[in-house]
Amino acid sequence: MAEEVITPVYCTGVSAQVQKLRAKELGLGRHENAIKYLGQDYEQLRAHCLQSGSLFRDEAFPPVPQSLGFKELGPNSSKTYGVKWKRPTELFSNPQFIVDGATRTDICQGALGDCWLLAAIASLTLNDTLLHRVVPHGQSFQNGYAGIFHFQLWQFGEWVDVVVDDLLPTKDGKLVFVHSAQGNEFWSALLEKAYAKVNGSYEALSGGSTSEGFEDFTGGVTEWYELRKAPSDLYSIILKALERGSLLGCSIDISSVLDMEAVTFKKLVKGHAYSVTGAKQVNYQGQMVNLIRMRNPWGEVEWTGAWSDGSSEWNGVDPYQRDQLRVRMEDGEFWMSFRDFLREFTRLEICNLTPDALKSQRVRNWNTTLYEGTWRRGSTAGGCRNYPATFWVNPQFKIRLEETDDPEDDYGGRESGCSFVLALMQKHRRRERRFGRDMETIGFAVYEVPPELVGQPVHLKRDFFLANASRARSEQFINLREVSTRFRLPPGEYVVVPSTFEPNKEGDFVLRFFSEKKAGTQELDDQVQAILPDEQVLSEEEIDENFKALFRQLAGEDMEISVRELRTILNRIISKHKDLRTKGFSLESCRSMVNLMDRDGNGKLGLVEFNILWNRIRNYLSIFRKFDLDKSGSMSAYEMRMAIESAGFKLNKKLFELIITRYSEPDLAVDFDNFVCCLVRLETMFRFFKTLDTDLDGVVTFDLFKWLQLTMFA
């Protein structure tokens, strides 16, 4: 069959953002209505290829060196020399997508350090429901084959349907990366390609944690527990996790490469990924014993210690309960006591699944909430608590805890409280590796809302954080894709502040909140408003004679001040203030001020108009000096935020981002002339809006002429 190039259609710009928000409100991005990645529709593309008799070739992830990588696997790397992209039909006469179901033997690592991803894929094979959410049914190299396949992945809060062609990297007729033990089975290699596509290249997959893959295949959130420092109620946590259908895995750390696959005295394998499949309390000789059931997915090597298959401990258990627990010999699954589990294993991972991943009606679901946010230098990237001058500008999210955990969940005798998990994930960092950007160091802190602010959607300011310690926080700030921590706090309102470790580190993030009981959440942001003094417009007769004399001297014969004259006047004035760091008012800045203050539309300022501008500038100068805290002659972007609020303006995060982008220097300093221009524009625009908002509903309607008049001359 001939090959035909299919070009994807991309949505860009503001319209794409609006479309995305609307579509999300309608349910787009949920698993049952996954987003078509890069706008590629699998069914349409496949039908087109079948109709035209061509095999699909994906120009969004083409078979070229750049798709392999950028450094170790870059275009000129020795590791990629001789790589040829071939279809399975060119390698085998009878290639298969899946043979006799997906199993762990379908996944063998190739020349890529993505064992973390392959371990996650292997774990998927233990759960058919989850597997076929990622690997949709009905794909093959026989019926309706068109060289096109698709997979569904969770990406930062949304499910995406990813289309790939089946051109795979080969050397000497063999797959370079993941392959099956049988050789002719290709679902795992094609899934790896789909994952490489969303991350920009195969090389971007090098290095990671299994939990990252787990989350992208389930949409869940992972908790980590070091078993040497296990919380007293860990067994209760495991019971509840299993009850909710969570995926649990554990392992024994290795101290060197030589320990890999080493078998302990009691037949546990180091460096291996074990699944936790059950937990049960049994009555043993009159005492309740906590047991945990394990599965070794890699083989039949089983634990031989207490409570293992055929051990004497089972003789002390009621036969009916023993039969219920289905103790069998040599099936890769075994029981052990929870005490031995803590002693023998090193690490436990719990991947909590979202409600849409759980089809069973028997499991108890988490309540989940997801927020997307950004850190932008100068406006919302304040760094951690170590930087008190800027920490407060970070995005803030409120949690309202109302219902305490069920009494039967209070294993270990702790005081009642509300359990929840917070997970902070940074977005798109793998994809940005080719540009030299790697994971930022991230974390979060949790603060209790003071009584006087309960129920108010107020973005907490600097003074609050200077006076109050955090109530809880992430266990560490670390350069991983996600940081997650389980908390248990009394009912009340709390504010979560996610941040990078250092200020001015930019990035996008997702903050997820998983609660045992229903809880209220909201993003905190200031409401846009201005508290402006009544504008005193004096008549010419009321203006001070000294000011009139000054004006006549400055304005010249026409008794009006032009843009150039205003620039000369203002720069002469500020040159006398040696404490101000400024390059002087630009012609464009002065034109802006004239356009905004010019009431009769002649492009010049008369006596009254200049008097209003003059008084404003004097007021702005006093504010500028007040908030130039280090007396540097300029304000930082963060000082400017406080100064703007002092001038009577409350703005939200997005507006501050725009202002800092527009009015700050590359080093985020704001000089006096830019500060004045910003405030003049803000005040005039607020007053303009207030004049048009006659019914005070916060909405005005423009015709095209008014809109152009406002935007072209503002």
From Swiss-Prot:
Site location (Cleavage): S15, A16, G27, L28
The family database entries (Gene3D superfamilies) matched by this protein are listed as:
2.60.120.380, Cysteine proteinases (3.90.70.10), EF-hand (1.10.238.10)
Q: Where is this region: Domain IV?
A: 543-713
Residues with the modification Phosphothreonine, per the entry, are T354
* Residues given in the record as Ca(2+) 4 binding sites: D628, D630, S632, S634, E639
Question: So which cofactors does this thing need?
Answer: Ca(2+)
Which keywords appear in this protein's UniProt record, sorted alphabetically?
A: Autocatalytic cleavage, Calcium, Cell membrane, Cytoplasm, Hydrolase, Membrane, Metal-binding, Phosphoprotein, Protease, Repeat, Thiol protease
- A single cellular component GO annotation: cytoplasm
Positions with a binding annotation for Ca(2+) 1: Q109, D114
* GO BP of this protein: proteolysis; regulation of catalytic activity; self proteolysis
Q: What is its EC number?
A: 3.4.22.52
Give the catalytic activity.
Broad endopeptidase specificity
Subcellular location per UniProt equals:
Cytoplasm; Cell membrane
Is Cell membrane included in the keywords of this UniProt record? yes
Please list the residues that bind Ca(2+) 2: D318, D323
Give every EF-hand domain span. Answer: 585-618, 615-650, 680-714
CDD domains registered for this protein in UniProt? Calpain_III (cd00214), CysPc (cd00044), EFh_PEF_CAPN1 (cd16198)
Region annotation (Linker) maps to 527-542
Q: How is it modified after translation?
A: Undergoes calcium-induced successive autoproteolytic cleavages that generate a membrane-bound 78 kDa active form and an intracellular 75 kDa active form. Calpastatin reduces with high efficiency the transition from 78 kDa to 75 kDa calpain forms.
Q: How is the cofactor bound?
A: Binds 4 Ca(2+) ions.
* GO MF annotation: an example: calcium-dependent cysteine-type endopeptidase activity
Q: What does this protein do?
A: Calcium-regulated non-lysosomal thiol-protease which catalyzes limited proteolysis of substrates involved in cytoskeletal remodeling and signal transduction. Proteolytically cleaves CTBP1. Cleaves and activates caspase-7 (CASP7).
Quaternary structure?
A: Forms a heterodimer with a small (regulatory) subunit CAPNS1.
Give the family, as the similarity comment puts it.
Belongs to the peptidase C2 family.
This chain belongs to the protein called: Calpain-1 catalytic subunit
Source species of the chain:
Sus scrofa
Its ancestry begins with: Eukaryota, Metazoa, Chordata, Craniata, Vertebrata
Gene assigned in the entry: CAPN1
